[in-house]
Amino acid sequence: MARPSLCTLVPLGPECLRPFTRESLAAIEQRAVEEEARLQRNKQMEIEEPERKPRSDLEAGKNLPMIYGDPPPEVIGIPLEDLDPYYSNKKTFIVLNKGKAIFRFSATPALYLLSPFSVVRRGAIKVLIHALFSMFIMITILTNCVFMTMSDPPPWSKNVEYTFTGIYTFESLIKILARGFCVDDFTFLRDPWNWLDFSVIMMAYLTEFVDLGNISALRTFRVLRALKTITVIPGLKTIVGALIQSVKKLSDVMILTVFCLSVFALVGLQLFMGNLRQKCVRWPPPFNDTNTTWYSNDTWYGNDTWYGNEMWYGNDSWYANDTWNSHASWATNDTFDWDAYISDEGNFYFLEGSNDALLCGNSSDAGHCPEGYECIKTGRNPNYGYTSYDTFSWAFLALFRLMTQDYWENLFQLTLRAAGKTYMIFFVVIIFLGSFYLINLILAVVAMAYAEQNEATLAEDKEKEEEFQQMLEKFKKHQEELEKAKAAQALEGGEADGDPAHGKDCNGSLDTSQGEKGAPRQSSSGDSGISDAMEELEEAHQKCPPWWYKCAHKVLIWNCCAPWLKFKNIIHLIVMDPFVDLGITICIVLNTLFMAMEHYPMTEHFDNVLTVGNLVFTGIFTAEMVLKLIAMDPYEYFQQGWNIFDSIIVTLSLVELGLANVQGLSVLRSFRLLRVFKLAKSWPTLNMLIKIIGNSVGALGNLTLVLAIIVFIFAVVGMQLFGKSYKECVCKIALDCNLPRWHMHDFFHSFLIVFRILCGEWIETMWDCMEVAGQAMCLTVFLMVMVIGNLVVLNLFLALLLSSFSADSLAASDEDGEMNNLQIAIGRIKLGIGFAKAFLLGLLHGKILSPKDIMLSLGEADGAGEAGEAGETAPEDEKKEPPEEDLKKDNHILNHMGLADGPPSSLELDHLNFINNPYLTIQVPIASEESDLEMPTEEETDTFSEPEDSKKPPQPLYDGNSSVCSTADYKPPEEDPEEQAEENPEGEQPEECFTEACVQRWPCLYVDISQGRGKKWWTLRRACFKIVEHNWFETFIVFMILLSSGALAFEDIYIEQRRVIRTILEYADKVFTYIFIMEMLLKWVAYGFKVYFTNAWCWLDFLIVDVSIISLVANWLGYSELGPIKSLRTLRALRPLRALSRFEGMRVVVNALLGAIPSIMNVLLVCLIFWLIFSIMGVNLFAGKFYYCINTTTSERFDISEVNNKSECESLMHTGQVRWLNVKVNYDNVGLGYLSLLQVATFKGWMDIMYAAVDSREKEEQPQYEVNLYMYLYFVIFIIFGSFFTLNLFIGVIIDNFNQQKKKLGGKDIFMTEEQKKYYNAMKKLGSKKPQKPIPRPQNKIQGMVYDLVTKQAFDITIMILICLNMVTMMVETDNQSQLKVDILYNINMIFIIIFTGECVLKMLALRQYYFTVGWNIFDFVVVILSIVGLALSDLIQKYFVSPTLFRVIRLARIGRVLRLIRGAKGIRTLLFALMMSLPALFNIGLLLFLVMFIYSIFGMSNFAYVKKESGIDDMFNFETFGNSIICLFEITTSAGWDGLLNPILNSGPPDCDPNLENPGTSVKGDCGNPSIGICFFCSYIIISFLIVVNMYIAIILENFNVATEESSEPLGEDDFEMFYETWEKFDPDATQFIAYSRLSDFVDTLQEPLRIAKPNKIKLITLDLPMVPGDKIHCLDILFALTKEVLGDSGEMDALKQTMEEKFMAANPSKVSYEPITTTLKRKHEEVCAIKIQRAYRRHLLQRSMKQASYMYRHSHDGSGDDAPEKEGLLANTMSKMYGHENGNSSSPSPEEKGEAGDAGPTMGLMPISPSDTAWPPAPPPGQTVRPGVKESLV
């Protein structure tokens, strides 16, 4: 066994690789026997074995570690002994292939026939491990995949199929021969990936030989072959591992999701059952027998057409189905069939372009029908009948769709139209709780699983690196020793013959023949072997072979002659100058601008300018590259990534110039756009984000591959399963019976559908699929893609991005404070400007300053912009980052030097560091005159001397705690509390009105407050200060703000009709304005201008009041109708913003957001740059190509055969019915390109853009259906990079930023107010409950029996089962159920109500008043009461109030019962606990979101109230009233449907809309929108709500999920303590807090894991050393501490935990009994053992004495003489003489007993009386307690 162990300790090269022979096998068997014997011995001696694990670097599939060197060719491909010590006694061997990959095999005979030494098996192994074999299999799989993508395979493909099956069978055969089938480890079926192969092959044979009916379904199994690629590509297995891990972890979330969705679905079922079938049906004409007359303004013609009322109120035409035929099935001459009439679709009201009839409702706030139509429940549900709440399953699907937010705006609008706007609440709850919370929980879980997986791999890599370092150290030491030995030998003059490292088993000679060619191989000397080994190791870390470096030095470094070198140096000086960099950067920006200026239509002149510009820029960049090549030599030039990047782009630009006129290569122009990325060189954020994307691309590369495989598999599955159906049943989904755009008939379209599902849009394509191919199959496939692809893989994608975002990556972006060339150049320019300024000022003042003086004065005034040079002159080691306080001081100095109004820029900070950074050593001459810096004002000195925690940054914007304008918590910033108390006994005082600089400039501002007017003024200011500081004043102002905001909500389109309200509002507006002016003036007087205008919140108030003042003045002057004034009035919508500073919750969030704004803006800019590239590319590809010719009457496009281009269309225009029209959102310029990209990235409105792109031909040509099909790929690529990447970067940046802010606050939550933090901590402490008194068992016998029943666990379980059954009965309800079913369900419900009422009554009976002390019981009670009330009321409501809504809401109470299930499930409780912990923060963000919605809806009402009703805007969803606006904005919060709302607003004039249209009831004219305002409105709202607020929501959930899981994954959670206390209650019913020592064993055995110590536990309890009080009692806390210590182990944190537990307990139990422990369990045991020892010793002593006495008595009785008796008196003597002696005590004649004793030859010799049971002392050990010898010895 020595050999392998030595090898693994110091594996010096390939000698460790020994062939596997029969001897090796025998040795293994021998070792296995020895090991078994050793284990048996250890088991008997109870020695615990440390668990052994296989070495991770020697796992099968990994490459042979470098430390083994290169294996010699003779060991490749043959069985070798296993290197891993773990397998030293297991029958395995390894084989290496040429790539040094390890394959591990079982050494048992394969298939019971082939031993490892058989020729067949060795041959199979050689084939299996060969690289060509796996390559061949890989190629086969890929070819097979190509064949699978054929939609109509040719006849010969069958033979190809057989070939593939044959190859796969051959592969499996080889594997089985080489590995064995399934008996041992490392055999064929022990690898789960092989199960895949096996099942695929079996399926192939099954489908071939057995007729199984639906073949296509089974043939789809072949697709799984694509998964085999995963086994061949190494990185993929890790990702798949992470995927599988995350799926395991998702189980709890999945259960919670399904549970929540079920509850919501039940709610939906109760509320909206049957609602979506309510349609507008034309009211039928009255019939009589002879003639049919229609009593109305219109006439009914027997056989002809009915001219219906086509106009509905609104400005749009709604097309009804106009032709009625009296011979329809429902009308005969004598009867009228009502059912047939209302189910005839001809009588429904359809909107133009809609497949479904218009829905309506009967409640007041639901949708209404046009005149002549009635709302009747009939026909099928919308969307082929698949969108409904009629049964539980459809409701569940609808809610799942709502949760994944796919096309949910449609569901939202349908539901609100049918049921009423009040039900928006239902959607709000589900979107926020269901959608945001659950979906992000999935993200949180996946992210966590990935992070864990990642940590594991990182740890492994680190280990390897360390191992490598150790090996190098060993080699070096070894080499040193050898050299020493050599030196010693040389001194001795002797030569060592042979190998100095001879005794070693694995000597270090490595095969270096593959290194440098021609190097002789000297393996004879160990010395050279080791140095070779070191070289090899070093080389392994180098990228290229050595000859490559030699060659590169010769060819790529150009140093030929001296003049050339001189020239080179000059060029180097020029090219490397910072100004050149600045110039190049400006050129890049200009070039980008030039490219962005392209548009359609463009004049020829403009086009020429752009072309010339492009040539110039190409020239500049080419020149830069050539000069750099000369200056740096290619060798140096190509060492830098940026230069390589430059050279590629320049080359592409030149190629593009050459190919400029070739058709179809316009895309090459887009490569020029990559120049934009050169900005990253000097733009840290862009640089960092590119790095982050780079970092994640490695892992993402693998993930993308997995995603691609998944997409491929599902695309093929879809095509195989549904392709035919799409072709055959196409008429069900398309009126013209042509395949729609989204189908699965061929692979490309199938791929697009799967990709669309990954983007989160699955429901619409699924409806089509269900219509053509049946529901079950489509649901299965689509939901699988959705769950696997979208929820898991895409979340893993996000998790990867988030993981590459760590604070380090952000921090590192500054490159350790070095300045880049750009900053140096700008610094120089600033310096130059400053120099010129100072020189001119000197001239003006008549002083000519020397340059030195100028420099000096600059140094004082603005930090001598020589930061760059300063940095260079400082010694390297002193370029440290300045500490934070210095930066804070810098801020103050900046503010007082009048340099900065706002946070100093990095540059200014650099200059400042230069001035007062103690870490820079620069000699500065002494200043000649005093400067600001030397005489800090009073305020500054204060600030410097303030303690750390009271320092406030100078910019109040970021100031989370104090805001003057919310005076509730105003504190004057400067003074220390102590000073304040001394100076100012009456409390706080106002500050100076003006800053000192102002007073110095204008001395008249100085007021003496000690006398005269000044004193009065001071008194007035103090009075104002008191008023303003008063709480009531603040409350009053808040109330006014709320009222004035509320007043804005009334100004809708009906305001002109409501005269009274209008008048009231006008007056109110004036009153509010006066009040706010008054408040502002008071604050000016109280605080002074200095304080007021240095506070950001006050500025906000000031600006908002200004708006009111201006509109007030305009009203007085009669200019209120002026355009600018009107638009100013819309700014009143900002009034609610004033509430921000007053509500602490919102202010906290806003402060957090403001802190994040810089980084958010940075990322936004980077994203815009990213998108700019796609936008310009879009302009290149699509500008002017989206126009089409349309027939305006039928809204149909002309076919390409009728109209081919713009001129043909214009020739038809004289008919008046034709227009040459553009798609509203297009790529005609970069701005519109951005809008298009935003719609694509949010997946809203992207279909129209994509269709237009795919149909586009050339500029001014009529589009043709899918003529440009592969343009889909532009969108696919953009979605991957522009949407997945950039939008997720936002989440990353925001989360990262909040984490950094938290760090600064010392880990406190940044989204919660102090009050809410208390709630949060209370939630966390839920577990620290005191032991409650258990509810005492009642005395009454019957009550007692009930009590026993109710407290049994079985009772609880039964109730849970009943709740589940009740849930099932609720799910069974459907719309239109038969009367029988209604009655049955009613009765079942009655039974359940009786059961639950019974349970409630039983519990009340048993638990008496204690019933209401448990929260869940109260909940149960409420539910029962509501159920009973519901039963009673349902009849009343149906009889007297015909309000189905009320009735339905009451029925919801039953669903409450389902929630009781939560009690039982621990995993779900954790997740809900995370939600509960997030609530306060989420509430704050919700408030902020509501504020934003409020402001935007007011703004929307004033701008878009009258736009034309089309696409997304109709009679219910519009901006006419406040309620409608809020509904629309809620919809857009998730970015749903914003394209529909934007469309009508983009109508800017006729013929799209009519600017002179009269709007009845108001004086406003026209129904046109304002495109620019509309675009700004929607884009800003989407960015604010979707990107910021929603992402903050995500950040908080991720955070709290981590906290909650940490709580639950810790070995001990609050639940465990709760369980401890629950068990305690049973053992300590009187809550004395003590338990008898005798019951301790039972108590710890009754606990649940992890605290439980199972019986036999006596010894364990003794070793716990628990303190005991008199009466042998133990306190509950002591037991808890001991058990906790047992679980967590003894650590430093333990004491802290103990202290907190004690504090919690003391707080919870003020009555804690004071106790003084007198002993401990361990001491008690010691005492017992000692007592037993003493007893035994004493017994022995007694025994000896009785022996002596006995022998004396014996002798005495025999010979009568002898010495004195040893025991003359005492117990022993008396007893013995009583029993054996004479009456007188020393009689010489023996008694008969004694004779008997003597006669008995037994050994007892009269010792019987001294048995322990007879002696009163010492006491016997307690019965039943046997003391084990081992314990006795150890304890004493």
From Swiss-Prot:
Residues 1310-1312 are annotated as: Important for rapid channel inactivation. Changing S246L: No significant effect on channel activity. Residues 392-416, 747-767, 1231-1252, 1522-1544 dip into the membrane without crossing it. I repeats lie at residues 113-454. Glycans are attached at N214, N288, N291, N297, N303, N315, N321, N333, N362, N1191, N1205. Changing G1537S: Found in a patient with variable manifestations of essential tremor; uncertain significance; the channel has a tendency toward faster activation and significantly faster inactivation at near-threshold potentials. Residues 39-63, 493-530, 863-885, 930-992, 1778-1836 are annotated as: Disordered. Changing V1293I: In PMC; without cold paralysis. Changing G1306E: In MYOSCN4A and PMC; severe. Changing N1205K: In CMYO22A; uncertain significance. It is found in: Cell membrane. Changing M1476I: In MYOSCN4A; highly variable severity. Changing R1132Q: In HOKPP2; changes the voltage-gated sodium channel activity; increases membrane hypoexcitability; increases channel activation and both fast and slow channel inactivation. The channel is inhibited by tetrodotoxin and saxitoxin. Inhibited by the conotoxin GVIIJ. III repeats lie at residues 1013-1326. The record marks Y407 as: Important for inhibition by tetrodotoxin. GO terms for molecular function: voltage-gated sodium channel activity. The chain crosses the membrane at residues 132-150, 158-178, 193-210, 217-233, 253-272, 424-444, 579-597, 609-628, 643-662, 665-682, 699-717, 779-797, 1033-1050, 1064-1082, 1097-1115, 1124-1142, 1160-1179, 1270-1291, 1355-1372, 1384-1402, 1415-1432, 1446-1462, 1482-1499, 1575-1597. It comes from the Eukaryota. The Nav1.4 voltage-gated sodium channel consists of an ion-conducting alpha subunit SCN4A which is functional on its own and a regulatory beta subunit SCN1B. SCN1B strongly enhances the presence of SCN4A at the cell surface. SCN1B is also required for rapid channel inactivation and recovery after inactivation. It prevents the decrease of channel activity in response to repetitive, high-frequency depolarizations. This is Sodium channel protein type 4 subunit alpha. The gene is SCN4A.
